[in-house]
């Protein structure tokens, strides 16, 4: 049975809650001792992982809609992408304000250039910014065929963001490896699409 438009609306409500509730938890953890002895790193990793989760969820929508024969699921993709950008922005902000500090923001540019994993992170964020700014129907009409070409660049983020995570951890743990593996699996589902590009 296919999902109805009303069911998709309720699904969107649930997805908005999924995007907002982690923020409430983070505020609670900050104010009630729910973080470790290095709360700055905890906040950075939490916001980054949440952004990655929404990125993976965004990439999951198309194959899930196709294989489950639920075309209306596509309507949730933009919402998931926007939450991915929100959490990626919180991740970047947590680094700029908590790691560097508001008085050292002038160092941000040099830090992004001198540390390769940060370079990958800011490239990913800039791509997400471009996709967010052009995610409206107005932008889609204005850009025409170029809109899809631009939004295919999300696959670059699917490569760079997990590498950014893997590179940023001092001790390799299963978690970043799992995220990288999931991203590769979701890209592999698009093998035919990529193959057509290279013909």
Curated annotation (Swiss-Prot):
One of its GO terms (cellular component) is plasma membrane. This is Protein-methionine-sulfoxide reductase heme-binding subunit MsrQ. Its main location: membrane. One of its GO terms (molecular function) is oxidoreductase activity, acting on diphenols and related substances as donors. GO terms for biological process: protein repair. The chain crosses the membrane at residues 10-30, 82-102, 116-136, 153-173. Heterodimer of a catalytic subunit (MsrP) and a heme-binding subunit (MsrQ). Binds 1 FMN per subunit. It is found in: Cell inner membrane. Signal peptide: none annotated. The keyword Transmembrane applies. Part of the MsrPQ system that repairs oxidized periplasmic proteins containing methionine sulfoxide residues (Met-O), using respiratory chain electrons. Thus protects these proteins from oxidative-stress damage caused by reactive species of oxygen and chlorine generated by the host defense mechanisms. MsrPQ is essential for the maintenance of envelope integrity under bleach stress, rescuing a wide series of structurally unrelated periplasmic proteins from methionine oxidation, including the primary periplasmic chaperone SurA and the lipoprotein Pal.
